[in-house]
């Protein structure tokens, strides 16, 4: 049974369940076109969605600090120890509007990065802009006991002990190709 359809160009690539309420799910749709010599990542079909009725209805998460520009792949995680805390690793258009003033004050900030919500997705704070090669990895994992210790795979695997404010490399000296993560509880 199909429970959510966005478009013929988009599919769902990540889902995270609220550990305190299995009826609450977050899912990310990703619009992309890949050919033998190109990848177009992002478009109107890329979005973050939430359901509180086990998928009967879905609402797109918009506003509240979440990027309003064109998005690409979005990785998701809900903190097991505090289900109000949700992380999203967002690939987003870095230039949502033409920049007319090329001075530093006129430049637009990049929207790519790790976002954190402390209120189950109602509002979002951009924690950092570390999202290298987002379309390829975009895995986010939260320590089962500490909602502020978060890991995310880009190039390389990064981690933070303060909810994403401070970023450290978790894989120094190890090849950068990491497609899955698991945290030993």
Model-derived segments and spans:
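Beta-propeller blade termini and top-face loops
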Residues: 1-185
